Amino acid sequence: TIQLSLPYRNMGLSGRVTYAFDDRYFFEGNFGYNGSERFSEKERYGFFPSAGLGYIISNEPFYPESLKKVVSKLKLKATFGLVGNDQIGAKEDRFYYRSEVNLNNGSYGYTWGNDYTGLHSVNGVSINRYANDDITWETSRKTNLGVEIGLFNDLELQVDVYRDYRYNILMSRASLPGSMGLQASIKSNLGEAISQGI
């Protein structure tokens, strides 16, 4: 289709701020404000912030020197953020807010005539995709908690617990009755998925 030959147009604005105090307290904040051509005007832009904190307890004055000989480093950290994804569906479904109509579908045409006059056929019209102004960014909410432990100034261990909750996953609606007379499947941001672990 012609839409595959068009240049892709996306916009993005991003920013970051970092702060560290006395080699003990750390903060980092990021954001992305992104626009995608794939969605309608009301859903085109998404704001995706993230933040991270770090705390090195072993650098505190109250941290015992006797413990420091064994646990030479003890750091706690946490991050939380949102990530947006506009690369959803097939590449042919580039503009979800527009219908895609096939004006030359032989499966929906008609034929007339007979063996004596000759058979004549004309291709028909079919709908491949209905316009949907409500399709939007698939979003992932990521959370991570971790600890870094240094032993004897030589060995370092890291343990992280993470949770990734994805929502607004693009899926086909399965509960529409055939009596509605729709030719193409209806897609919406219906799906959810969770992954978590250590």
For each predicted feature, which ranges?
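Extracellular/periplasmic, surface-exposed regions of secreted and cell-surface proteins
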Residues: 1-198
